[in-house]
């Protein structure tokens, strides 16, 4: 939530990939960041053993610290990204994965693009009906920037610029309640 060295040092203990975000503002780390270095960690789906183990190792490491380092973090130590947009699918659009049914037919392996830097032209799926001619992508300022990130050519939905999706899910309920994913871009730091 902040780019000061102590925050980045704490994030570095959890992962080489660090994401700076300002929305949603209601996360606990935002409140704590007014008092001390605080981060939000992404551990995967609830109950996944790898995520639980990773979080436990991080907490054990933090408990062994006498203090959080405050020296600047170099670009070699972390890959810093900024969340720039949220991809939403309207409730009126029927979604499917790996099939040609529904309005938006997403590739079956979509969740494998999670936290991967992908180039322009990466396929996300196909538009399988006339009900969808534009994917809703909302910037942090509330602007629809879908055309900046995705194109539909011959029914094929693909990225129009390099980007890193995060929190990609194939869970339709989560897509409806929250979003399909967030989009991130690399953030240069010194």
What are these regions (language model features)?
Residues 1-190:
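Structured catalytic-domain cores with a bias toward divalent-metal coordination
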């Amino acid at each position: 939530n902040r780019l000061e060295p102590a925050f980045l040092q704490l994030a570095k203990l959890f992962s080489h990939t660090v994401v700076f975000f300002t929305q949603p503002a209601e996360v606990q780390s935002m409140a704590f960041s007014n008092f001390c270095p605080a981060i939000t960690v992404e551990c995967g789906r609830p109950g996944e053993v790898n995520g639980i183990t990773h979080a436990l190792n991080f907490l054990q490491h933090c408990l062994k610290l006498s203090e959080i380092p405050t020296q600047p973090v170099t670009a070699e130590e972390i890959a810093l990204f900024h969340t720039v947009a949220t991809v939403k699918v309207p409730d009126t659009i029927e979604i499917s994965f790996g099939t040609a049914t529904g309005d938006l037919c997403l590739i079956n392996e979509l969740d494998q693009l999670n936290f991967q830097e992908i180039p322009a032209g990466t396929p996300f799926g196909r538009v399988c009906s006339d009900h969808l001619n534009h994917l809703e992508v909302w910037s942090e300022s509330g602007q629809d920037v879908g055309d900046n990130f995705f194109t539909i050519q011959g029914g094929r939905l693909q990225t129009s610029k390099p980007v890193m999706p995060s929190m990609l899910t194939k869970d339709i309920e989560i897509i409806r309640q929250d979003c399909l994913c967030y989009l991130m871009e690399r953030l240069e730091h010194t």
